[in-house]
Structures are given as structure tokens and as C-alpha cells.
A protein has these predicted regions:
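Condensing-enzyme catalytic core mediating Claisen C-C bond formation in acyl metabolism
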Residues: 1-26, 74-86, 90-92, 119-125, ...
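A short beta-alpha structural unit
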Residues: 6-12, 39-48
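Short, well-ordered amphipathic alpha-helical segments that serve as non-catalytic structural scaffolds
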Residues: 17-31, 106-112
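Feature representing long, continuous alpha-helical segments
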Residues: 21-22, 26, 36, 45-53, ...
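Short acidic capping loops at alpha-helix termini that bridge into adjacent secondary structure
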Residues: 34-37, 63
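Residues at the N-termini of beta-strands
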Residues: 37-40, 125
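Active-site pocket-lining segment
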Residues: 42-89
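Conserved beta-strand-centric core segments of catalytic alpha/beta enzyme folds
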Residues: 47-56, 84-145
Length: 145
């Protein structure tokens, strides 16, 4: 198991996902990978709308097509990638300061093959996206050999 890439950023902008876009670009460049190579993702879904907009910001689909990604089932088991198999922050209570660690543990379990009923089959790559207060974003790309 290794961290293959890391992206981060911060902004004072009250709206938008530009920082997530920039952090994802940095992440993919460092990892030498692209969004199409992500098998499982835990992203910061503090609202349903955030999740949809982050599909686009992280490059999982073109801008304006997150709805189609969901309708086609490409964000869940049997699709192109599985997003938030833990249920996401909304189901985990969005615990401040603990949610990033919970995401990391979830993704490592999938890469180790120890996620039980939530297991993403043959997961070898994973992406973590975390947003903090005041527009801070951290992205991490995990992989196993």
C-alpha cells in the first residue's frame, strides 16, 4: 500500500469548486494516474449537491453531466467506480476532525480486501477528498501493487 499522489489547496472564495479541481489536478499529476483509474473514492459529501459537483471537480465526468453519471449507475457497485462505500460523511455524522481518518481507514480496507460486505472487487486504486473549514482541500491517491 502506498500514497501515490497528494493534492491540496485553499481559497477564501465562498462558492465554487476551483480548489478541488486544482487539488485533483495536482494529485493526478503526482500519481501519474487519471480519474478513470480510480476504483473507489471517499469524497467530502457534506450535502447531496456537494457530491454531485465533486464528481465533476474530481474529473469523474465532464462538467454538467454528474446527473447522467448517477443515472447510469457509474458511481456505485457495478459502475466505473464506487463512491462513498462507507455511506459518506452524511451517514457517518460528519464528525469534525475525524472524518478524514474515517475515509482513509475505509479506503485502506478496500485496498487490503478487508471491507466485508462493502468490498469493491479487485480495488487497487483509491482517491480521498476532504474539505475543511475556510475552503481548504486535501486529496490523496492510494494504490497497492
Amino acid at each position: 500500500m502506498q500514497v501515490a499522489g497528494f493534492g491540496h489547496g485553499a481559497t477564501f472564495a465562498a462558492v465554487g469548486y476551483d480548489v478541488s479541481v486544482a487539488a485533483a489536478r495536482e494529485l493526478y499529476e503526482q500519481a501519474g494516474r487519471g480519474p478513470q483509474e480510480v476504483a473507489v473514492c471517499e469524497l467530502h459529501d457534506s450535502s447531496t449537491l456537494d457530491e454531485l459537483l465533486l464528481y465533476e471537480a474530481l474529473g469523474f465526468c465532464p462538467e454538467g453531466s454528474a446527473e447522467k453519471l448517477v443515472e447510469d449507475g457509474d458511481n456505485t457497485y457495478g459502475g466505473n467506480l464506487v463512491v462513498n462505500p462507507s455511506g459518506g460523511l452524511l451517514s457517518l455524522g460528519q464528525a469534525p476532525a475525524a472524518s478524514g481518518l474515517a475515509q482513509c481507514i475505509e479506503l485502506v480496507q478496500h485496498l487490503r480486501g478487508s471491507a466485508g460486505r462493502r468490498q469493491v472487487a479487485d480495488a487497487r486504486t483509491a482517491l480521498q477528498h476532504q474539505t475543511g473549514a475556510d475552503g481548504r482541500v486535501v486529496t490523496t491517491f492510494y494504490q497497492r501493487e
